[in-house]
Each structure stands twice: as structure tokens, then as C-alpha cells.
């Protein structure tokens, strides 16, 4: 890949132009990929499903993405790429994930996840060389247990041991690494201290072409049940010399770098995978409307409107977390874990609901119109969106709960309104500024502020009264959670093994989701009448409240019908079912 005019424009643009340029690139990519339902489109769903069935990457579409310079999206603008803000990155990548999660991971987003430690703590030479590699069409891969699980690097899969003549040698094996056989850079988390603790691991940036004979062995490809077109295989190291310039950051900084950079990975994953669920929702609306001259059958109203509201809630939560990475970089780590905790669970539930609408159509595996459900059900767990990821997020959230209850909830100031305001100019994502300790809880403060502002509307009636009552119900739940969390044992005890304690992270994360919905609704400027109306927020909050088991008011008259009308309108107009209502290729 060579430097493109778009890359040059991004590098020279001010913050006021970043969003417009990113949305233009996303629109161009959507157009290049073409109508996903056209059977003759080499980048359409039929072709992508066929590649998945063959268990091969879609070569033609990867070549198209190469030509579009997509790899530049993973390189910070200061090093010649297009990466400015995390929320804009997610919006740029959605056209790819809307069609195929495996393509999104296999083509390049893994490079973003792998290179985070280098952008956070690498030397100027490491950053420059890595940027040059990615901009030239190269790939990077990450070597630890899972793509997105911060706790998994603590397992002794790789060790860097002192060599007799000085320096370190890498040992260990991992059987399941995405792009292991075709990566041009390897970012390895290896144990460098036998003692357990936060200084046990270090990060190394390796060039696979600089390996001595006999010290690195490629292991066979492993076929997975999901993301079948992605290339998973293994690597085994037996005394591979680690050059002095391979260490990223300081020795023993690996765990801290993982915790800092994985908050980007978690938020980006959730920000893009909603686009894949959007495709399934479009399939369900197609199933519910095809062959009908009248309105959608009543039995499908609840699953269709409910999933639509959930997708808007997921997008709200992910977008707020992504924006916080730039605006509040030292305070976003708990929210990022909460997003990764909530969004996959909601999406799994949504797919189950949509399967009832699709019925037997959902088993037409190769059908572009209806095959997305089956594929996404298989892809999500392999993409790190299964139950193991939930445990990793609990490991981030639970240790913070007592401190937040004692010092942050109902005591902290609200975040800047730009966090929720569409079109606001925000600082860039700077990996070097990301924090992992303390920082309070700006989402809880936002929830309390939203409820206070809505309180005078509780007697007005209609949607706004329902919204005010829901906001107050979530504040009451936060208050109850505070009392429970104040009684937790101090950090460092074995509370993570207690199921009752882990449930608290579920309650907290759903409260954070509600805060995001309210914040995004309040941040509307009126340019989108649907999002400015309270109906979608009322429905989204009602579903979150039902999951929490808190009192939920009856939906006001016309609420669900208004949301359903918007969903059908978007389907017929070819618009996405997220906060952006993006025009889709047709």
C-alpha cells in the first residue's frame, strides 16, 4: 500500500475536519464493497459466505481493502496514518464488519490490537518502523491467550529466559494465533519474572524474518467453528534470540500495557460488531415484510422493536466509551470493560430473538438475504465475544466497585457534554495517555445528572414522563448498589471467586449502559427527529431495566409503534440501524 491522498488530507487536517473525512472514507468503502445482496457482487454476502464455507479468506475483497488503504486506519495520524479518534475508527470499519466479522479481524483489526503497546510505550524507531510496515501493506499479530482477554496473558505460554552469554531467549508455544503464518510483525507477551505479580511479563516486538534457524516453528492451521475464513495457526519458539531493541516499554511492563491498551480493543470490538448484528436485523425485517401488503404482523413487533432499541443502546454505550478514550483517557478503563461485558450479552440475546422472526429462513446458510444469522452466531465466540471475555471484564470491574461506592458515586462531577454530543470536536486517541488506576466514575455522575434534569417532567405525561421515571429507577438501583459495594472486602482478597460478587459487575455494567442511553439522548441537537424523540430511549431503558429486575413503567401509547415505523423506514430506505442511520450500498 502507498500513501494515498486521503491519508495526506487526514494528516494535514484539523480536528474540525476529522469526522467529515472519516465518514467520507466509510461511505467510499461502503460503495466499493457494493450491494451485499447482489449475487454477482464479488464482495457481497454470497461470495463472503462461500469463502467462509471453503474456510479461505476472501482474496478479492482483501485485495479491494488493500487498494482502499484500509491499513492506514490502524496507524496514528502522527506516524502517517489516518487514526485520529477511536470512535471514528469504528465508524470507518463498520462497512467491513457489516458484511463479515472474520474479514474484519483477519484482514487487519488484529493489527490494531497487536500494535497498541508500541503506540503506547514503544521507542520512536519502533513506532516509525511499525507504521511503515502497516502502511506498506504488512500485518501484525498478537501472541497471548486470546484476542481480547487481559487476564489471559498471565498464563505461562511464552517465557523469555536469560541466555548464557547475556540477553534473553524466547520459549513457548501457542496453537491458536490469527494470521500467525502471514504476519510481518509479532507482538509477544512473555513472562520475564518467575514471581507472580504485576511485573511478571514484558512485551517484545519481533520480526519473524530475523529468526535463527530452528528457533521458531510454524504449527498447522486449526479450523474453528466460527470465523472460518480467518487463518488460525500456531507458533512454537525454542530459544529464539530477543534483540536488545525488541523490548517495548520497560521490562515488567507487560501487564500494565495490556490493561491500558485492551480498553481500546474492547471498545472498538463492540463498536464494530454491532454492524454485523445490524445485518441480521435487516434480514429479520425482510422476513417479516416480504410478501405482505399490510403492516408487520403483531407477533413480530416486540422482537423487532426490542432488538432495534438494544442495538441503539449498544451503539450508545460503545460510542461513549470510544469517545472517552480520547476525551477522558485516564478514566475510561472501567467503562471499556463494562461495554465489553454488556454488548456481547445483549447481541447474543438479540440473535436468539431474531431467530424466532427468521424461522426456517435462518437456516439458509449460504443465502445472502438470510444467512447472516447462522454465521454471526458462530463467529461471535471466536471473535472473543463469548463467556471467557465476560470473566476478563469482571476482573477489571469488581476490584473497583468498593472504591467507586465509597468515593465516586453521588460525589463526582459530570463529564464534559462533548462526550455525548454528535459532531463535537474531541482530542485524538493517544495510547500514551491511557490510564488504568482510579479515575472515578463519570458515567454514574452522568446518570444522576440526567435524572435530575428530567425530574421536573415526571408529571407531564407521555414519553418524557416515562423517561424521567426510568432515569430515577436507575439512580435508585445505583444507590442500592452503592450500599452493597461498600460492604465488599478490600481489594486483593478472593472476591472474584464469589458468584454473588460477580453479579455486582453485571448490575453496574447495565447501569452504565442506561447512563449512556440517557447521555446520548440528551446530546441530540434535533437534526435527527427520531433520536431526538424519547421513544427509542424509553424502549431501550425499559429493556435494560427488565434485565436488572427494577420497576419499569408501562410503555406509553405509541412508543413501540413509533420505533417500529422507524425500523421499517430504515430497512426500506437502505439505512443502518445504529445512531448514524448510514446509507447502505444497494
Regions found by a protein language model. Give the residues of each.
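Amphipathic, small/basic residue-rich leader segments at the start of a protein or domain
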Residues: 1-108, 129, 435-496, 505, ...
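Short, charged, amphipathic alpha-helical segments
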Residues: 298-301, 333-338, 367, 528-538
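A short core secondary-structure module
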Residues: 173-217
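Glycine-rich beta->alpha junctions and the first turn(s) of the following alpha-helix
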Residues: 224-312, 421-516
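Extended amphipathic alpha-helical segments with heptad-repeat/coiled-coil character used for oligomerization
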Residues: 321-417
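C-terminal effector modules of eukaryotic transcription factors
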Residues: 509, 518-525, 530-532
Amino acid at each position: 500500500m502507498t500513501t494515498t491522498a486521503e491519508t495526506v488530507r487526514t494528516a494535514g487536517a484539523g480536528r474540525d475536519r476529522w469526522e467529515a473525512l472519516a465518514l467520507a472514507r466509510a461511505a467510499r468503502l461502503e460503495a466499493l464493497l457494493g450491494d451485499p445482496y447482489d449475487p454477482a457482487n464479488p464482495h457481497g454476502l454470497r461470495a463472503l459466505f462461500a469463502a467462509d464455507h471453503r474456510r479461505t479468506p476472501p482474496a478479492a475483497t482483501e485485495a479491494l481493502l488493500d487498494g482502499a488503504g484500509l491499513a492506514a486506519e490502524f496507524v496514528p495520524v502522527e506516524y502517517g496514518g489516518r487514526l485520529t479518534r477511536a470512535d471514528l475508527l469504528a465508524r470507518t470499519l463498520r462497512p467491513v464488519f457489516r458484511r463479515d466479522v472474520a474479514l474484519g479481524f483477519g484482514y487487519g483489526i488484529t493489527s490494531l490490537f497487536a500494535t497498541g503497546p508500541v503506540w503506547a510505550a514503544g521507542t520512536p524507531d519502533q513506532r516509525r518502523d511499525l507504521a511503515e510496515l502497516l502502511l506498506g501493506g504488512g500485518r501484525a499479530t498478537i501472541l497471548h491467550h486470546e484476542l481480547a482477554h487481559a487476564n489471559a496473558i498471565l498464563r505461562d505460554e511464552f517465557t523469555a529466559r536469560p541466555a548464557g552469554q547475556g540477553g534473553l531467549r524466547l520459549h513457548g508455544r501457542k496453537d491458536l494465533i490469527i494470521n500467525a503464518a502471514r504476519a510481518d510483525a509479532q507482538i509477544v507477551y512473555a513472562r520475564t519474572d518467575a514471581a507472580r505479580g504485576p511485573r511478571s511479563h514484558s512485551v517484545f516486538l519481533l520480526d519473524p524474518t530475523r529468526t535463527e534457524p530452528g528457533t521458531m516453528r510454524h504449527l498447522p492451521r486449526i479450523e474453528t467453528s466460527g470465523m472460518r475464513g480467518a487463518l488460525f495457526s500456531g507458533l512454537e519458539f525454542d530459544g529464539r534470540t530477543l534483540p536488545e531493541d525488541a523490548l517495548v516499554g520497560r521490562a515488567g511492563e507487560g501487564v500494565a500495557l495490556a490493561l491500558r491498551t485492551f480498553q481500546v480493543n474492547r471498545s472498538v470490538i463492540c463498536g464494530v460488531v454491532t454492524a454485523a448484528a445490524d445485518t441480521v436485523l435487516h434480514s429479520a425485517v425482510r422476513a417479516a415484510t416480504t410478501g405482505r401488503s399490510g403492516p408487520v404482523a403483531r407477533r413480530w413487533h416486540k422482537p423487532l422493536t426490542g432488538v432495534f432499541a438494544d442495538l441503539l443502546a449498544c451503539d450508545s454505550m460503545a460510542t461513549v466509551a470510544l469517545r472517552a478514550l480520547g476525551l477522558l483517557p485516564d478514566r475510561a478503563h472501567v467503562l471499556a470493560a463494562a461495554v465489553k461485558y454488556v454488548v456481547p450479552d445483549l447481541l447474543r440475546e438479540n440473535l436468539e430473538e431474531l431467530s424466532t422472526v427468521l424461522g426456517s429462513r435462518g437456516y439458509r446458510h449460504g443465502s445472502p438475504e438470510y444467512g447472516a444469522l447462522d454465521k454471526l452466531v458462530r463467529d461471535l465466540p471466536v471473535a472473543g465475544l463469548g463467556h471467557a471475555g465476560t470473566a476478563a471484564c469482571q476482573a477489571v470491574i469488581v476490584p473497583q466497585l468498593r472504591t467507586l461506592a465509597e468515593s465516586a458515586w453521588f460525589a463526582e462531577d459530570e463529564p464534559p457534554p462533548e462526550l455525548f454530543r454528535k459532531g463535537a470536536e474531541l482530542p485524538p486517541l493517544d495510547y500514551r495517555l491511557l490510564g488504568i488506576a482510579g479515575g472515578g466514575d463519570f458515567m454514574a455522575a452522568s446518570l444522576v445528572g440526567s435524572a435530575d434534569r428530567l425530574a421536573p417532567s415526571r408529571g407531564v405525561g407521555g414519553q418524557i414522563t416515562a423517561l424521567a421515571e426510568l432515569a430515577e429507577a436507575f439512580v435508585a438501583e445505583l444507590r442500592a448498589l452503592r450500599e452493597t459495594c461498600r460492604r465488599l472486602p478490600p481489594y486483593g482478597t478472593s472476591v472474584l471467586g464469589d458468584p454473588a460478587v460477580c453479579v455486582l459487575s453485571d448490575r453496574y455494567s447495565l447501569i452504565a449502559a442506561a447512563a449512556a442511553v440517557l447521555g446520548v439522548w440528551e446530546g441530540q441537537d434535533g437534526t435527527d427527529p427520531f433520536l431526538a424523540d424519547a421513544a427509542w430511549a424509553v424502549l431501550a431503558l425499559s429493556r435494560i431495566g427488565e434485565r436488572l429486575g427494577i420497576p419499569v413503567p408501562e410503555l406509553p401509547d405509541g412508543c413501540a409503534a413509533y420505533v417500529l415505523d422507524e425500523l421499517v423506514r430504515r430497512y426500506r430506505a437502505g439505512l443502518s440501524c445504529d445512531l448514524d442511520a448510514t446509507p447502505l450500498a444497494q
